Amino acid sequence: MLVNKKLLGLAVAASVLSLAAPVLAEDVKIGILGDLTGPIESLAPPIVAGAQLAFDQVNAQGGLLGGQIVSIVGDSACDPTAAGPAADKLVNTDQVTAFVGAFCTGATIGAANAAGIPGNVVQISPSASAPALTTLEDNDLVFRTTPSDAFQGVKLADLLTQKGVTDVALTYVNNDYGKGLADVFVKQFEANGGTVSANVSHEDGKADYRAELGQLAGSGSQNLVLIGYASGSAHTILQQAVEGGDFAVFFGVDGVIGDDLLAGIDPAKVEGLSATRAGAYTGESAEIYKKIATDAGQDPAATYAPQAYDAGFLLALAIEKNGSASRDGLSAALREVASAPGEIIRPGEWAKAVELIKAGTDID
């Protein structure tokens, strides 16, 4: 299934007789633009590994266009400013055909505007979830394999309502991701009959959020909803909120999920903390992926790792379908391999997919 900006669902879903010397297949460069440093650095390694796992499977099953995938990793630091030069290196210096990434929405848009779109390069983010990506003027080059926060915000609001929460204090990181998610959450929570007693934005990367916490605590709500990053604002705000003792229950979103969130915090002080993230895959493809990841020593439930695998596999399928490592035509090829109708390709079924593509059979 393919919905532009864009959601690519889990799809994973010629020889020429000549007397001349044989033409050797060339390797294909595909980038992974990950936020390896910055506020989601604790989330990044499994996401990179998920994309690399897809490439490793392609290489083990005959390769791409007869050659091998060579992956090149860049660091966009979850920062639109840093993402530009990092993407420029992949696009113009390394000359990748396409790339997976970035991971944060701001970095994804920054990479696209600075290098991806001007370079006619397809990119698929496994985790950029802000609604702002949907309206990006991208020449049909920017895609994602995770749902928009237009969906996550609704689910977060519904979760709180189901738990009997009627009022919250909300703080969100002041960027496309944070504001987009907060806006959707507030609208749905209020539609459910809830009250947002305080709605305070914050800047990421600060050492002290006590002023913001003072505003939030002043609302009188005992429930704090935190939209931020595990290795950045979310950890610091949570730690200082626990120290202040003004809140009894904490809620978060996908960005707060990470090993760094509870560093130095007594788990007993945040007992009952709940967070939303992209739902677990279900069905036959999900079970196949779980086995593939487990056999490779990876955690199949790691946040956005399945979506990264999906992104990497889809790019490889699109390049094979396109018939060359050229950037031209790749976006259209991606839509062909990721959309119905067609024979379903499960995770790991690279050799099968190549046979079908060569036979002119539609795949999905």
Positions of PLM-derived features:
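Sec/Tat signal peptide C-region and signal peptidase I cleavage site
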Residues: 19-25
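Extracytosolic ligand-binding ectodomains
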Residues: 2-6, 10-11, 25-364
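Bacterial N-terminal signal peptides
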Residues: 9-19
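Long, low-complexity, tandem-repeat intrinsically disordered regions
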Residues: 1-2, 17
